[in-house]
């Protein structure tokens, strides 16, 4: 058949959990439920986030805030071209904002590097915007494109990130550009 990839349900992993026991039990249960067999040289893998969680090896929002404050003096911090994510990046952004007075967030547009769109290419064409030359402020972005929600998640990431920054106690400045210079 070739390579087969499966998502396997497992319990919520907490610090100190026996990850080996959980993984073995979870894949054996999935095998029994779904009727597939393991063969010599099959590989079972899990995301590093699961391992880190079981080891208690991750940074909290407060850890990130303390690090940002110590390294950048708690003033203005710039974050360039994050991937649009409610999970991984949002937690980091909370910590960054909690450790700074101001966060300048530069978002690439019309999409991030993995293809998550803020706005459609058609909308850019309609407004005559060249994403390789035009730098937009938040105000200009809203004037041109309004409040766009992600097709699959239904989230307006611009509004979401701005609110995360402000709720963490920092001033937010959001810029849309594709050249970090």
Regions found by a protein language model. Name each.
Residues 1-181:
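N-terminal and secondary-structure boundary signal
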